[in-house]
């Protein structure tokens, strides 16, 4: 468990991200793809059902022994809360109510945030725009680990710890890499979340709040669904910086596995991403792809060529001009 990862730096490239050019080519060849850029009519109902399910779980958690509370937080709540963060990801692209109603999408994301226990939705949207616009951009894309992470988490045991601590790194990294001023929506997100947490605590006590927070921390940490964090952009094959996953867990994660398709067309809702591949299979079928997030996690931990440094990075124009 002590072998160090083989990489000592990121994979620096001097080309633009590939998705912009792919998008232009595909739209020119398949204009029917534009018809997929419409709101998901079922997203709001699915998310509402998930939020209500977690509220019911909170009520049930009052009578659970602590060991069972943490078991169900991992086995059930972790799946639901992780999936809700992926719903928030989808909503951040205005797929719940359409691009013409950005305010409704923002407030609905805050509603979806409620079972997560901590304010997340507004901050995620603020930084996720840069992830698409400046994929791998040095100092801009906060999805890319820091040098500190790459140098410290370089052995199997440390990489395992890094995976378990993903919620903390995703929270703290933006503050270190690309700090931004707090927005009004972030303040609203925080106030609404605190009010919801206080209400749950007042009604049902401590255990439901512990259940929700444990669901988020465990579900976003060392959990099978968390394989998507690594599968999406970690360089399993040199020259490829985005990968899709075509496995069964897409059914409960809003098709987040269709990640190549998503970066090619961010405005297409998750429910329509499989149709992109169906319309233009020659753009996807030959690319390297994943079929098991558990295997992704296993390979990441035990393959010396993989680690936090196994990411493509580039210097973007905005980064050059920031000073």
Swiss-Prot record:
Reaction(s) the record says it catalyses: a dihydroceramide + 2 Fe(II)-[cytochrome b5] + O2 + 2 H(+) = a phytoceramide + 2 Fe(III)-[cytochrome b5] + H2O; an N-acylsphinganine + 2 Fe(II)-[cytochrome b5] + O2 + 2 H(+) = an N-acylsphing-4-enine + 2 Fe(III)-[cytochrome b5] + 2 H2O; N-octanoylsphinganine + 2 Fe(II)-[cytochrome b5] + O2 + 2 H(+) = N-octanoyl-4-hydroxysphinganine + 2 Fe(III)-[cytochrome b5] + H2O; an N-acylsphinganine + 2 Fe(II)-[cytochrome b5] + O2 + 2 H(+) = an N-acyl-(4R)-4-hydroxysphinganine + 2 Fe(III)-[cytochrome b5] + H2O
CDD domains: Delta4-sphingolipid-FADS-like
Gene Ontology MF, one: sphingolipid delta-4 desaturase activity
Major subcellular location class: endoplasmic reticulum
Residues covered by region (Required for C4-hydroxylase activity): 95-99
UniProt record, GO biological process: ceramide biosynthetic process; sphinganine metabolic process
Membrane-spanning intervals of the chain: 45-65, 68-88, 209-231
Functional pathway: Membrane lipid metabolism; sphingolipid biosynthesis
Short motif (Histidine box-1): ranges: 89-93
Disulphide-bonded residues: none
EC top class named in words: oxidoreductase
Motif extent (Histidine box-2): 128-132
InterPro entries linked: DES1/DES2, FA_desaturase_dom, Sphingolipid_d4-desaturase_N
Compartments, as annotated in UniProt: Endoplasmic reticulum membrane
Alphabetic keyword roster: Endoplasmic reticulum, Lipid biosynthesis, Lipid metabolism, Lipoprotein, Membrane, Myristate, Oxidoreductase, Transmembrane, Transmembrane helix
Motif Histidine box-3, residue numbers: 259-263
Membrane topology type: Multi-pass membrane protein
Lipidation residue positions, type N-myristoyl glycine: 2
UniProt function note: Bifunctional enzyme which acts both as a sphingolipid delta(4)-desaturase and a sphingolipid C4-monooxygenase.
Record family assignment: Belongs to the fatty acid desaturase type 1 family. DEGS subfamily.
The protein, known as: Sphingolipid delta(4)-desaturase/C4-monooxygenase DES2
The organism of origin for this protein: Bos taurus (Bovine)
Organism placement in taxonomy: Eukaryota, Metazoa, Chordata, Craniata, Vertebrata
